[in-house]
Amino acid sequence: MTDIPVARLRNFCIIAHIDHGKSTLADRLLQETGTVSSRDMQEQFLDNMDLERERGITIKLQAARMNYCASDGEQYVLNLIDTPGHVDFSYEVSRSLQACEGALLVVDASQGVEAQTLANVYLALENDLEIIPVLNKVDLPGADSERIKQEIESIIGLDTSTAIECSAKTGIGIPEILQSVVDRIPPPKDLLNDPTKALIFDSYYDSYRGVIVYFRVMTGSISRRDKILLMASRKSYELDEIGIMSPDQRKVEDLHAGEVGYLSASIKAVADARVGDTITLVDDSASEPLPGYTEAKPMVFCGLFPTDADQYPDLREALDKLQLSDAALKYEPETSSAMGFGFRCGFLGLLHMEIVQERLEREYDLDLIVTAPSVIYQVNMIGGETLLIDNPATLPDPQKRESIEEPYVRIEIYAPNEYNGTLMGLCQDRRGDFVDMKFITTDRVTLIYEIPLAEVVTDFFDHMKSRTKGYASMEYHLIGYRENDLVRLDVLINAERADPLTTIVHREKAYGVGRGLVEKLKELIPKQQFKIPLQASIGSRIIASESISALRKDVLAKCYGGDISRKKKLLKKQAKGKKRMKSMGKVDVPQEAFMAVLKLNQ
């Protein structure tokens, strides 16, 4: 494909908040340039997982190459790199931005600028991208283009005099967008003669060909007969094929600086071809990789257990396969007295966790029990060593540790003014430290807080949405660890510690959480033939307790009248049996009980 000069290449991506119409806009661009015929077109063409279409979110990055005849009569090649909009996947966004020279900033003309839009715009500005503002959904009755333009100018500082108004649904403004991509986004630098470097911005697992890597050639060129070297993992591979996505894969002989394509080289696992890694040639390798590569670090952990113990090998196989296509997923085997064998898994965030869980249940037909999510705590021991704890049940005893530090995030919430008070209340309930409050426009405000990540991962998002009728949006990033007075709260069911219910909480909140937990468990655990005590404890001190009364069979039903000693004998016999059951009986804890821990509004 080297017949197109670099000057006529354009690489761009679309930045938007969830639901602002990014995937629909991508569909229209593909249709307008004739890349996909109207017959093959389907909604959200670039979102190919069912789950993505169903939730209406983009999870994996996609790319498409379009040929476009501009107003000057020349043929241009436009590479669209689709990005996920969700905060959990911000690392993937930053990598795809590095592969572009420009971005379309899509803002919903009825809703205005939202949190994730801003987070991604700042990433784009860091990468020196040319940003073209686009107002989408102008056909809606509630659209107010002028107000939104002012909002973009005051919040982001972009000149919106040339902003394009469009409606991806009806096709208004699509030709103007394509023309402005050609006119305003700069072509890639012409670095054909430098040593080859290519940036991996996505990879996925194909069960026939192994890992398919999507990359952008930054300098030099790659041809089908080359032997490649991945610089982070130091592994080399023979190429099987390289090609372009238009949007179906088409083989080509070579790709040069500025072009975007895919390659397959019988790579076994996605972890070998990490997003952000640099591809170079074995024979003429680059001296240093492209900047910015980091390994995805999991922030949220939870236990996954099969409801049926026989499914444990299937769960292991399913996780192995998922990890081939999801390099950010980490897991290790774990056993628990209450739940049997399972895995402790690490995720980028709550959405990532839900998606993995849903894919396991849907694609691999597993029934899972998921324990409450937790974060990584840093425990400073008395001997001076530091432990990282991701499972609350493994927290060392108080006499062995000096202090516990927990991760903090800086959270920015964008919302209409009238919800200011209720949001500040929510952040204070969650142990947040107030940092700043900015009025963006006369009726919108940004609140900035520093909050422990553990308070954000459970149900902060749901509460924020319900308190603001869905109008608020948020964005957060990790800022480091801070020491706090944290304790381990254990739950004892029938005097046995239930590991999956163990949580780490702030000492001030321990009583409330413990009280709430045992009350909730009392509602959810079915009665047994014997009395079940439920207790919440910190170390050996019980701070809250409830008990589930026994189901009682009426053993006196068949005694009509008669002597009292007969009745006493039967009651004594029953009491003896109950005592034996209590010492031997096991209590089955239903899945709802574990989920109750999540729902306990901290």
UniProtKB/Swiss-Prot annotation:
Enzyme Commission designation: 3.6.5.n1
Protein's UniProt keywords contain Hydrolase: yes
Protein localization: Cell inner membrane
Enzyme class: hydrolase
CDD domains, per the entry: EF4_II (cd03699), EF4_III (cd16260), LepA (cd01890), lepA_C (cd03709)
PANTHER family: TRANSLATION FACTOR GUF1 HOMOLOG, CHLOROPLASTIC, TRANSLATION FACTOR GUF1-RELATED
Protein name, per record: Elongation factor 4
Gene behind this protein: lepA
